[in-house]
Amino acid sequence: MPVYVQQKVLTEDVINNINVVFAYLENDKKSGGTALATFLRDSDQGIGIRLKKSHGDQIGCYWDDKEFRYNTDKMKEDIGSLEELLRNERTVVFAKGDFDSYNEQRFLEVSPRSYKYFKNRITKLLRIYRP
């Protein structure tokens, strides 16, 4: 099944589409984040893609590239879960607004290699599964 990119996902979208999985950005501590991330974290329909250590914009909240293998192992696991769902005919929705809300400049400053890996994996997933 396909992966869709929707500008904004509302809680009603999740509730009214029980067979759809919604991807959101997550952190290792599974705390904070957007209202959508908080809602999806507690939903069977949400799959978080870990991209940081913890919620916040301080440098310590971000993985750094000294932890590249650790960082990418977590991303591989999360993105791999999405790929498995797609191979099993599930529909996945990315909330573009949620992905746009993170601080790209901070990632490029603190963990450029890890961030590049993330962007490449997401781009590949969208290229393969987007209708």
Write out the residue ranges for each language-model feature.
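Macrodomain-like recognition of ADP-ribose-binding/processing modules
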Residues: 1-131
